[in-house]
């Protein structure tokens, strides 16, 4: 499950690169939304993996 948290974090960082960096001007809004969605998914998955271990 920790693997998924890392994957979601990487996807969020890539979305942030496109959304906040201004690389893809047409997709800025979508990239910003995806960034926050995947950050939330990464945090939730990380917390669930900690709860599963403990």
From Swiss-Prot:
It is a multi-pass membrane protein. It is found in: Cell membrane. Pfam families: DUF1328. The chain crosses the membrane at residues 5-25, 28-48. GO terms for cellular component: plasma membrane. Keywords: Cell membrane, Membrane, Transmembrane, Transmembrane helix. The keyword ATP-binding does not apply. Signal peptide: none annotated. Its main location: membrane. InterPro entries: DUF1328. Belongs to the UPF0391 family. This is UPF0391 membrane protein Ajs_3511. The lineage of its organism: Bacteria, Pseudomonadati, Pseudomonadota, Betaproteobacteria, Burkholderiales.
């Amino acid at each position: 499950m920790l693997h998924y948290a890392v994957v979601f974090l990487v996807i969020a960082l890539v979305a942030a690169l496109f959304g906040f960096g201004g690389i893809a001007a047409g997709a800025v809004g979508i990239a910003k939304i995806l960034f926050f969605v995947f950050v939330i998914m990464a945090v939730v998955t990380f917390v669930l993996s900690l709860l599963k271990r403990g």
